[in-house]
Amino acid sequence: MEADLKRKIKRLIEDRGGFWSAVKGGEYSKPGDPDIIACYRGYFIAIEGKSADGSPSEEQEDCREWVVDAGGIHIYAYNLDVVRSTLDLIDACEDGGGDDGSGRRSPLRHHEGP
């Protein structure tokens, strides 16, 4: 299930003109690294694919905190709709729907599934 979800996430990002890279374990990775790193309309997004009954590890929670503190978006993707809604929020911000009156785009931070 998790592999199928990750494949669908990658396809969704590609279909909407974004970039993604899959993080593979190995010598240069560390515990907690997200499954997918993406860039969509200039936003850095770290995505951790999760099964419906999965829960994040302590290392994954640390990674989430680091990404958010650095100004990126972190998603625990329990389903494709979580990723789709995050991309929709980015589109709304970039297309003028997220203007907070300051002239800056509204910040998006952590978006998490159910």
Region spans (language model):
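Catalytic phosphate/metal-binding cores of nucleic-acid and nucleotide-processing enzymes, i.e., regions
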Residues: 1-114
